[in-house]
Amino acid sequence: MSLYDKSVTATRSAHRTSDTLHSLVAGSVAGGLEIAITYPAEFAKTRLQLNQVSGRNKQNVPWPRFGLQWYSGCIPFLIGNSVKTSIRFVSFDGYQKLLADDDGNISRFGILLAGFGAGATESLLAVTPSERIKTIIIEDRRLEKPRIRNSFHAMSIIARDHGLSGFFQGFWPTTARQSAGSAIRLGSYTFLKQVVQSRTPQGGKIGTVKTFIIGSLAGLITVYLTQPLDTIKTRMQRLEARTRYGNAFICARGILEQEGFTAFWSGAVARSLRLVMSGGIVFMVYEKVVEGLDVISPAKRYEIAA
């Protein structure tokens, strides 16, 4: 191998590393900013799902005045979402490369599989523990005398009462929701982006407004197809879920028999609001951060120079 070939190989390797780092940084920034803006809608969604209890024991607790209480459980959710978003984009890019042909092309089914893989990966590494902490904090705030002081206190209670496995309570419905959600969201976003790109003059870029709209539509599609899984996930992560439900299948049957089919879409409007906004924010910020990092990337400059 010539010195030039070695240089080109090293440049390509550095560029791949740079791409992964860019995805990681951009995903974290996009996820963190999205939660800071949209968390009150997540709080409302979770409260609505926890309030749906049938019969004489219906627990419709008065809503707190809008303010800091609407950010209860935000810190673990913010951390988890930032990590999750990074994992989602990095793993999605990785799975797409694995499923692509020799020319780098990937089918729509391949995009769907990459989305499922990204969802399962993010659920395992970030989502389930952070959402478990968030859910019990929000549920605790519904009590007349809340006992959980902060996120660290919530973690100590989970560890004390349930051990390490307590952080993964609701893992299967969470994984199902994340896998389906990522497949639908990323798949629909990629498809819609390809459609818009095909109608864009050659060499032209999709503008910020169009990117926001595409991301928002992808978020809206995701909500109504995955809301039943989200409702089951929330119920399975509440404080007394193990004694009340046992497992996700019993939980789903109980919701259907006691509350009716529509109960699976509890909080759908609030989640729609959040995911429509977050879909636009995440994809728009992600694309812009990646563009900015590409401008200052040494690997990018070397490749152009080569």
Swiss-Prot record:
Solcar repeats (start-end): 18-98, 109-195, 206-292
Pfam families assigned: Mito_carr
Membrane spanning stretches: 24-44, 67-87, 113-133, 170-189, 209-229, 267-286
Alphabetical keyword list: Membrane, Mitochondrion, Mitochondrion inner membrane, Repeat, Transmembrane, Transmembrane helix, Transport
GO function term, MF aspect, one: citrate secondary active transmembrane transporter activity
Membrane topology term: Multi-pass membrane protein
Pathway where this protein functions: Mycotoxin biosynthesis
GO cellular component: mitochondrial inner membrane
Family membership noted in the UniProt record: Belongs to the mitochondrial carrier (TC 2.A.29) family.
Role noted for this protein: Tricarboxylate transporter; part of the gene cluster that mediates the biosynthesis of fumonisins B1 (FB1), B2 (FB2), B3 (FB3), and B4 (FB4), which are carcinogenic mycotoxins. Within the pathway, FUM11 is involved the addition of the tricarballylic moieties to the carbon backbone. FUM11 makes a tricarboxylic acid precursor available for fumonisin biosynthesis via its export from the mitochondria. The biosynthesis starts with the FUM1-catalyzed carbon chain assembly from one molecule of acetyl-CoA, eight molecules of malonyl-CoA, and two molecules of methionine (in S-adenosyl form).
Protein name as it appears in the record: Tricarboxylate transporter FUM11
Originating species: Gibberella moniliformis (strain M3125 / FGSC 7600) (Maize ear and stalk rot fungus)
